[in-house]
Structures are given as C-alpha cells and as structure tokens.
Amino acid sequence: MDKRHTIMLIAVAVIAIAPLVIYSGLGEDQGYFGGADDSASKAISETGYKPWFQPIWEPPSGEIESLLFALQAAIGALIIGYVFGYYRGRGESPE
C-alpha cells in the first residue's frame, strides 16, 4: 500500500475514534447527546402548542418506524448515486 494511502487511513481512523475517546461517558447526564427531536418537542410543549391535525397513519412500533426511515434513506442514496453516476458517465462518453 502506498504511504499516502496509509496516512489517509490513519487520519480517518483518528477522526472516527477521537470523539468516542474524548466524550466517553462525559455529558450523558447533562443531555449533550440528546436528539434534536427531543429538544424541539420540549421547546414546543413549553409553549402550550396544540397540533392542528393528527397523523393519517402511525407505525405500530418503533422498529417499523426505523425500517421506514432506513428505507427512505436507502432510496435517497440510490437516487443521489444514480444522478452522480449519470453525470459522470455522460462527461466521459465519447461523442
């Protein structure tokens, strides 16, 4: 393997592992890693907001909700990959 590739792999590993080492267990009590949904719902509920309508359908469990989210992300990634591949292939085609 080329020296440049080795340095790049080490840099990626350091970038991926550094946050885990720095924040290992710190800040969990203060809610540093709470999701944006939790913060937003808390801020909205403090104002006394009442929703205008109810959802048409709610997934029966959290697992199905996660499945639908993952499926949506996969479809989006496929579309983005197709568009990038299409334009890259169009740029390389001999016309």
UniProtKB/Swiss-Prot annotation:
Pathway: Cofactor biosynthesis; adenosylcobalamin biosynthesis. InterPro entries: CbiN (IPR003705). Belongs to the CbiN family. This is Cobalt transport protein CbiN. The keyword DNA repair does not apply. Forms an energy-coupling factor (ECF) transporter complex composed of an ATP-binding protein (A component, CbiO), a transmembrane protein (T component, CbiQ) and 2 possible substrate-capture proteins (S components, CbiM and CbiN) of unknown stoichimetry. Keywords: Cell membrane, Cobalamin biosynthesis, Cobalt, Cobalt transport, Ion transport, Membrane, Transmembrane, Transmembrane helix, Transport. The chain crosses the membrane at residues 7-27, 67-87. It comes from the Archaea. The keyword Protease does not apply. GO terms for molecular function: cobalt ion transmembrane transporter activity. It is found in: Cell membrane. Part of the energy-coupling factor (ECF) transporter complex CbiMNOQ involved in cobalt import. It is a multi-pass membrane protein. GO terms for biological process: cobalamin biosynthetic process. One of its GO terms (cellular component) is plasma membrane.
